[in-house]
Amino acid sequence: MITAYIDFKSLDCFLAISPILELADDCETPVSWKPYRSTKRALPTQVANESITQTHHRVRAESERRLQQHYARLRGLDIDPSRGQIDTSAALGWLANLEGDSSSFVSRLFTAHWIEH
């Protein structure tokens, strides 16, 4: 069994769904989807006298955002990064209470949140 901890508002999690499902299919094993509440850090802005730590956080956040957009484009997805700020707690609660194979629920909800909004 593959155990995957996910948060519907996480773009990284959304981009990982297809590979996880493909791996599970290739290995003929089920996926146990576990809700996980992540916190989205705001994209830091450059300030006049920023410290080395502030510079590091800003550059890293910008790099993460560009990398996510790159992988989304490779998969032909048009992603609005602001969707990561929307609260998905209710959906995580539903997931926690589902029994059996919840892969279709997870896949549909991620698509609805990130693509069809």
Regions found by a protein language model. Give the residues of each.
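Local sequence-structure signature of Cys/Sec-based thiol-disulfide redox active-site neighborhoods
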Residues: 1-20
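Structural alpha/beta surface segment adjacent to cysteine/selenocysteine redox centers
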Residues: 17-113
